[in-house]
Amino acid sequence: MSKKSGRNIKPGELNLKEKLVHINRTAKVVKGGKRFGFNAIVVVGDKEGHVGYGLGKANEVQDAIAKGVEDGKKNVIKVPIVKGTIPHPIVAKYGSAKVLMKPATPGTGLIAGGAVRAVLEMAGIHDILTKSLGSSNPHNVVKAAIKGLQNISDANDVAERRSKSLKEVFES
C-alpha cells in the first residue's frame, strides 16, 4: 500500500471511538485441562473520515479489547468522503473475503452487513451500498473493507497523477 499509507495521521489528535466487531475464545490444552484465551477485532474511528482496525489477544476479554483498541489506533487511515459517500465504486479482496462498495445518493443509508457496517460507521460514511462476497470471516472482511477504503482515489489524487488541474479532470 505505498499509494497512501496514512502514516502522517496522529491518533492522539483525533477523537476516536471504538466498536467491537468480533470476540473469539481460543483453547490451549495443557496437562491440567484447558487454558482459555480471547481475541477481539476492534474498529476505531472518529466518524469524520478516519478509521482503523486492531486485533487484541489476551487471557481476559477486556484486556483483549483494550489491546485491539491500541492496535487499531496504530493503523488509522484517512478516507475521502464526498457528500456522505465514497467518490467511486471499488472492489477489494483480502484472502477469500471480497467486499464491493458503491456510492449512493443522499438518503439511501448505510446498506452493509456485519463487519463492513462497523468499518463504514466508524469512518463516517452515511450513504453507501455494499456487498460482502466469499468468506464471511470477520477478520478478513474487515481487512478487505479497510483495503478498499485505502485504495479510494479522491479528485486531487487523480489530478496529481494525470498532471492536470481539478477542472480538467472533471471535464474529461
Curated annotation (Swiss-Prot):
GO terms for biological process: translation. It comes from the Bacteria. Keywords: Ribonucleoprotein, Ribosomal protein, RNA-binding, rRNA-binding. Residues 16-79 form the S5 DRBM domain. InterPro entries: Ribosomal_Su5_D2-typ_SF (IPR020568), Ribosomal_uS5 (IPR000851), Ribosomal_uS5_bac-type (IPR005712), Ribosomal_uS5_C (IPR005324), Ribosomal_uS5_N (IPR013810), Ribosomal_uS5_N_CS (IPR018192), Ribsml_uS5_D2-typ_fold_subgr (IPR014721). The keyword rRNA-binding applies. It holds the Pfam family Ribosomal_S5. One of its GO terms (cellular component) is small ribosomal subunit. PANTHER family: MITOCHONDRIAL RIBOSOMAL PROTEIN S5 (PTHR48277:SF1). Part of the 30S ribosomal subunit. Contacts proteins S4 and S8. The N-terminal domain interacts with the head of the 30S subunit; the C-terminal domain interacts with the body and contacts protein S4. The interaction surface between S4 and S5 is involved in control of translational fidelity. HAMAP family: Ribosomal_uS5_B (MF_01307_B). With S4 and S12 plays an important role in translational accuracy. This is Small ribosomal subunit protein uS5. It comes from Chlorobaculum tepidum (strain ATCC 49652 / DSM 12025 / NBRC 103806 / TLS). The lineage of its organism: Bacteria, Pseudomonadati, Chlorobiota, Chlorobiia, Chlorobiales.
